[in-house]
């Protein structure tokens, strides 16, 4: 192993709850959770007591092992308290954004049949009528009572007891896939999902992503998405101070500085926002040590700027179905060049990957060949999902012999890194040629004056489809400058892409529609761009 020495890891608890409670044993007076505005603060010993109290309330409502509990989230400490209280009983936390339309909440209930609902105080439902789908089950408002916080909690064996019947394979939570289209699917995640990769990093002595006891982390990511839930639970299991929810300003710079944040995880749009604020204020965040980012393709210039301030970065790639992160691209020599080329990283040790040249034909299919250099990515990770709840047909399509079909198209290059090209379902087929959307986006974003770019499909009788391109300019442009930028973009495509991949239409827009996790909503983009009568057509 190249002379590298590995330290034997102590036997760690096999559930998220037991790992958090272990931190409470070691540092009971340390703050575990609080909001950005300082409210809802919980010390680790107080968190243990609150978990026990809320679990008792659920037990009184006949919630037990295997029950589903709808957690109406506001991303604050009460949301994570709810998840841990469910874990105390072996119940499954079904994560739902508190600002979702009632119809979406009711659809989630139809899919998961919850036995109870926990409502965080900052969610829309906390101050409005309860949806009809919840009328038949107990609905509990989660509130961290001041009298409870001010009392002295002793950490005895009973309060620190987790659930002896639970292990790493038992389910902890469900997250509904955001996606850009299609029916919502409830991704069932085991306890191991939230610590498998951190355990690998510790065992292998890798510093790609690191956690330090007592450090402050901040997550603006929703607890209803894998990135937010994974990040905060992981930091709790490592004894961090987790700041989440309760934002009293839109300024990321102010939040990070005021709370002396050491680590954070952002989607690329928020990373761009932070860079813009740092440049405008000519400032740095002295406490900041690490910025993780993922969810969609990042802008290399943003990563370069952050790293120039002395802050490490780590791009993480994964899906809800793969347990957040399966590939990683940390700060390293040449990492910026790789990001510019569309790299998303390389797999962690213990994570297997396979590129299928034929869509739908996975690594264990009869006659499957070796991994291709380009194709649909399959991942076998110890963090992979258990399956889609109550959806065996879809589970059988996506999860085969422990391998998850990501649906993403990637290229593996000689440097061992993987480069994203788009989703197989979003491929644009022009004149029989497969066009990878992310490659089109990447070429456009390499043009000076382009802040963001995303392509979309334009139906065409002759070719089947043409490529349309929407661009967000780096600065406000008049008509002449806009036309010049479009011609510059077209010229770059003539130099760098095959003819069928060259945009037939280029439109400058103010923003690109994205999901909460930062993925481009290409169907919405196509509809909006097509309706824009002011667009300029550029043939090239």
Curated annotation (Swiss-Prot):
Keywords: ATP-binding, Cytoplasm, Fatty acid metabolism, Ligase, Lipid metabolism, Magnesium, Metal-binding, Nucleotide-binding. It comes from Mycobacterium tuberculosis (strain ATCC 25618 / H37Rv). Induction: Repressed by CRP. Retains a single open conformational state for both the apo- and ligand-bound forms. Homodimer. Its EC number is 6.2.1.20, 6.2.1.47. This is Medium/long-chain-fatty-acid--[acyl-carrier-protein] ligase FadD10. It catalyses: a medium-chain fatty acid + holo-[ACP] + ATP = a medium-chain fatty acyl-[ACP] + AMP + diphosphate; a medium-chain fatty acid + ATP + H(+) = a medium-chain fatty acyl-AMP + diphosphate; a medium-chain fatty acyl-AMP + holo-[ACP] = a medium-chain fatty acyl-[ACP] + AMP + H(+); a long-chain fatty acid + holo-[ACP] + ATP = a long-chain fatty acyl-[ACP] + AMP + diphosphate. GO terms for cellular component: cytoplasm; plasma membrane.
């Amino acid at each position: 192993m190249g002379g590298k020495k590995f330290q034997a890891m102590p036997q760690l608890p096999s559930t998220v709850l037991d790992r958090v409670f272990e931190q409470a044993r070691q540092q009971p007076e340390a703050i575990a959770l609080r909001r950005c505005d300082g409210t809802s603060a919980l010390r680790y010993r107080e968190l243990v007591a609150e978990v026990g109290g809320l679990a008792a309330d659920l037990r009184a409502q006949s919630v037990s092992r295997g029950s589903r509990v709808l957690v109406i989230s506001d991303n604050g400490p009460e949301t994570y308290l709810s998840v841990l209280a469910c874990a105390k009983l072996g119940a499954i936390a079904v994560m739902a954004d508190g600002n979702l339309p009632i119809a979406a909440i009711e659809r989630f209930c139809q899919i998961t049949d919850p036995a109870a609902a926990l409502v965080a105080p900052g969610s829309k439902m906390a101050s409005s009528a309860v949806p009809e789908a919840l009328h038949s089950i107990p609905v509990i408002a989660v509130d961290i009572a001041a009298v409870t916080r001010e009392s002295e909690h002793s950490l005895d064996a009973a309060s620190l007891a987790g659930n002896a019947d639970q292990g790493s394979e038992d389910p902890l939570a469900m997250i509904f896939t955001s996606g850009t289209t299609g029916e919502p699917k409830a991704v069932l995640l085991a306890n191991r999902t939230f610590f498998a990769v951190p355990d690998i990093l510790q065992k292998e002595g890798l510093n790609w992503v690191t956690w330090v006891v007592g450090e402050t982390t901040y997550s603006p990511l929703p607890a209803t998405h894998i990135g937010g839930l994974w990040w905060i639970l992981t930091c709790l299991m490592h004894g961090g101070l987790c700041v989440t929810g309760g934002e009293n300003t839109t300024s990321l710079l102010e939040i990070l500085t005021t709370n002396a944040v050491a680590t954070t995880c952002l989607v690329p749009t928020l990373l761009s926002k932070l860079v813009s604020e740092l440049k405008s204020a000519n400032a740095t965040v002295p406490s900041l040590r690490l910025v993780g980012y993922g969810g969609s393709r990042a802008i290399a210039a943003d990563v370069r700027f952050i790293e120039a301030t002395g802050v490490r970065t780590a791009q993480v790639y994964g899906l809800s179905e793969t347990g957040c992160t399966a590939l990683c691209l940390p700060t390293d020599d040449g990492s910026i060049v790789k990001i510019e080329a569309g790299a998303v990283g390389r797999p962690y040790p213990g994570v297997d990957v396979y590129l299928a040249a034929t869509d739908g034909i996975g690594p264990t299919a009869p006659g499957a060949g070796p991994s291709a250099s380009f194709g649909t990515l399959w991942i076998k990770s110890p963090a992979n999902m258990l399956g889609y709840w109550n959806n065996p047909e879809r589970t059988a399509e996506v999860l085969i012999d422990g391998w998850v079909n990501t649906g993403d198209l990637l290229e593996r290059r000689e440097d061992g890194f993987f480069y994203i090209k788009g989703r197989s379902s979003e491929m644009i087929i022009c004149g029989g040629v497969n066009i990878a959307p992310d490659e089109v986006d990447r070429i456009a974003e390499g043009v000076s004056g382009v802040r963001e770019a995303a392509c979309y499909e334009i139906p065409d009788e002759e070719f089947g489809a043409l490529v349309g391109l929407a661009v967000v300019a780096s600065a406000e442009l008049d008509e002449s400058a806009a036309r010049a930028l479009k011609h510059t973009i077209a010229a770059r495509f003539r130099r760098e892409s095959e003819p069928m991949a060259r945009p037939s239409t280029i439109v400058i827009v103010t923003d690109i529609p994205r999901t909460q996790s930062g993925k481009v909503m290409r169907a919405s983009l196509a509809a909006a761009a097509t309706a824009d009568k002011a667009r300029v057509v550029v043939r090239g």
